[in-house]
């Protein structure tokens, strides 16, 4: 009979999100993860599929928080919600202005070396979600007459996403 778990998966993930955000995927070794989580290498492998699985779970938690808090107002918003989102990127102390940059941007940059298809999909999904939120706000503003009907909303949203990536990269420096 298997022993019952003496840990909460969400508590374990909560403990590693910040560590991965601060140090990156490659810089955190399995021994450090064992110390942070209280789990041994076997438990990390069986519960999360190893270090990469734990990282993906942490990245997913981070993304869900950003989507449900920072991005959410743009889903039904217009220009003011986009402005508020962008201002938060440069407002010290906000979730989106961390000295560690953005975990998603950091993951994308680091994955150029790691070359994990799973990480690539997770990063792309986040940026697609952000772009969809920008499109929603821009389209609402266009319907409301705040943006000329001739403006390509998708191109504008794509440009905003690129700008967000740049700000997050700059925040890390």
Regions found by a protein language model. Name each.
Residues 11, 19-53, 57:
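Helix-turn-helix
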Residues 81, 96-118:
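Amphipathic alpha-helical segments used for helix-helix packing
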């Amino acid at each position: 009979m298997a022993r019952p778990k003496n840990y909460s998966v969400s508590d374990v993930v909560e403990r590693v999100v910040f560590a991965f955000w601060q140090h990156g995927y490659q810089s955190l070794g399995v021994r450090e993860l064992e110390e942070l989580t209280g789990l041994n290498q076997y438990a990390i492998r069986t519960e999360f599929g190893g270090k990469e699985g734990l990282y993906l779970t942490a990245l997913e938690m981070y993304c869900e928080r950003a989507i449900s808090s920072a991005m959410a107002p743009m889903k039904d918003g217009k220009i003011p919600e986009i402005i508020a989102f962008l201002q938060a990127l440069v407002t010290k102390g906000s979730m989106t202005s961390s000295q560690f940059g953005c975990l998603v941007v950091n993951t994308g940059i680091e994955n150029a070396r790691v070359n994990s298809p799973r990480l690539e999909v997770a990063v792309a999904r986040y940026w697609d979600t952000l772009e969809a939120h920008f499109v929603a706000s821009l389209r609402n503003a266009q319907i409301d007459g705040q943006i000329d009907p001739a403006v390509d909303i998708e191109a504008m949203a794509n440009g905003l996403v690129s700008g967000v990536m740049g700000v997050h990269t700059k925040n890390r420096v």
